């Protein structure tokens, strides 16, 4: 692996990691997803609908002769609303993946001005509870 990708060993041990940052962090998260997908399946929940999988494909291409197979290791789900984020997390929590789970832009849809603040808070609390449940599984 070239040093431009995030350095770590794959497959990942069964530990949980949390990365929080500005939208600029998304490039590093795509590097993480690309690196993980070279060695194993990875589930990606894009809660802000901002991830660019073409960028992930470009990162993967130099490291494999079969980028399509590697891209098939990425299981991507996108949410456009905070209601969809909750539904997505409920579906994943009902059948937790054995592979790494990457959640991108969790808070993005909860800031929607078309959603009442109390509803957004309730949905966020429920979503955080599901993430806690997933981290313990």
Language model: regions and residue ranges:
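Pre-Walker A adenine-sensing motif
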Residues: 1-11
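Conserved P-loop
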Residues: 12-87
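Residue-level signal for alpha-helix termini/capping positions
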Residues: 34-38, 93-97, 136
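Loop/turn-to-beta-strand initiation segments
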Residues: 73, 98-101, 136-137
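Flexible beta-alpha connector loops of hexameric P-loop NTPases
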Residues: 75-77, 113-123
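Short amphipathic alpha-helices and their capping/turn segments at secondary-structure boundaries
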Residues: 85-101, 128-131
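Conserved P-loop NTPase "ATPase switch" module shared by AAA+ and STAND
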Residues: 97-113
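Substrate-engagement module of ASCE P-loop NTPases
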Residues: 121-137
């Amino acid at each position: 692996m070239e040093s431009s990708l995030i350095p770590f060993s794959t497959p990942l041990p069964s530990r949980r990691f949390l990365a929080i940052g500005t939208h600029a962090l998304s490039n590093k998260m795509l590097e993480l997803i690309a690196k993980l997908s070279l060695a194993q399946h990875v589930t990606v929940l894009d809660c802000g609908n901002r991830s660019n999988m073409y960028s992930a494909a470009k990162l993967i291409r130099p490291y494999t002769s079969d980028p399509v197979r590697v891209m098939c290791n990425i299981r991507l789900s996108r949410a456009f609303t905070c209601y969809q984020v909750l539904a997505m997390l409920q579906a994943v929590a009902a059948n937790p993946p054995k592979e790494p789970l990457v959640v991108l832009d969790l808070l993005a849809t909860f800031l929607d001005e078309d959603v009442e603040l109390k509803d957004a808070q309730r949905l966020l609390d429920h979503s955080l509870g599901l993430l806690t449940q997933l981290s313990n599984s």
